[in-house]
Regions:
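Short beta-loop-alpha junction of Rossmann-like oxidoreductase domains
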Residues: 38-40, 98-101, 218
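Short clusters of hydrophobic/aromatic residues that line enzyme substrate/ligand-binding pockets
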Residues: 4, 43-45, 96, 102, ...
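Conserved active-site region of classical short-chain dehydrogenase/reductase
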Residues: 9-17, 70, 111, 144-151
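Glycine-rich "substrate-gating" loop/helix at the edge of Rossmann-like oxidoreductase active sites
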Residues: 2, 57-61, 93-108, 132-145, ...
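Active-site Tyr-X1-5-Lys
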Residues: 14-17, 38, 56-93, 112-124
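C-terminal substrate-binding subdomain of Rossmann-fold SDR/epimerase-dehydratase oxidoreductases
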Residues: 119-247
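Conserved Rossmann-fold NAD(P)-dependent oxidoreductase catalytic core, especially the SDR/UDP-sugar
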Residues: 6, 10-60, 88
Length: 247
């Protein structure tokens, strides 16, 4: 945990400071929904930052991301007028799509499910057993939508971007706008892959947080909305996974 925190702090600090030193006027810092307190109300609003204790298992990563947000805000305050510095931060929800990590031991939920259901389909396995009750709710955003949102935020006039926050709370959430249960997600993945066997859940295994849903109303109010629904996004993600198998 110590090395992880150190490396994340150093990477972003070097990038942000080097950007300033080399005359980079605009920069975007990508955070994570884990910056918000463990017990924050749902959906997660930008104003909830630093209002409570963090989730212990994610604390080093969250602290690094919070530091990056505050570093961007502080550089804006110190160097905004003198050097035209305009460093912005966005907080994405759970992302998925082409280019994801499908490793069986350290992938996130969607690529993990894609791999498992694909292997079950190929082997004609009659059942796929998923850890947990399937009841926790999560929000997912297709990677192309995240890229589009990032460009949208970077292209905003500075006065418009600044008017939707304050100098020390300038980050913007980027989410899909609705969430699904893990059980619903599993069935969506199975449909995208064409797996027709049984899907079961092992409720003796831990579930994690019951819900994690971003409030993206600030970004929506600026005029941006996601374009790729979950079903279409999963089909695209699966085709990308098949491509990795042929490499």
């Amino acid at each position: 945990r110590g090395e992880f925190l150190y490396e994340n702090l150093m990477i972003q600090s070097n990038v942000i400071h080097s950007a300033y030193k080399n005359g980079v006027k605009k920069l975007m810092f990508l955070g994570s929904s884990c910056i918000y307190p463990k017990l924050a109300p749902q959906p997660l609003k930008e104003e909830y930052l630093l209002t409570g204790l963090l989730e212990p298992t994610n604390e080093p990563y969250a602290i690094a991301k919070i530091a990056g947000i505050k570093m961007c805000e502080s550089y804006n305050r110190q160097y905004g007028q003198s050097h035209d510095v305009d460093y912005r931060s966005v907080m994405p929800t759970n992302l998925y799509g082409p280019g994801d990590n499908y490793h069986p031991e350290n992938s996130h939920v969607i690529p993990a499910l894609i791999r498992r259901f694909h292997e079950a389909k190929v082997s004609s396995a009659p059942e796929v057993l998923i850890w947990g009750s399937g009841m926790p709710m999560r929000e997912f955003l297709f990677v192309d939508d995240m890229a589009a949102a990032s460009v949208f935020v970077m292209d905003l006039e500075k006065k418009i971007y600044d008017s939707h926050g304050n100098p020390m709370e300038s980050h913007i959430n980027v989410g899909f706008g609705s969430d699904v249960t893990i059980a619903e997600l599993a069935h969506e993945v199975a449909n995208a892959i064409g797996y027709q066997g049984k899907i079961s859940f092992d409720s003796t295994k831990p579930d994690g947080a019951p819900r994690k849903w971003m409030d993206s109303s600030k970004l929506n109010g600026l005029g941006w909305a996601p374009q790729v629904g979950l079903s279409l996004g999963l089909q695209s993600a699966y085709q990308a996974y098949l491509t990795t198998l042929s490499l």
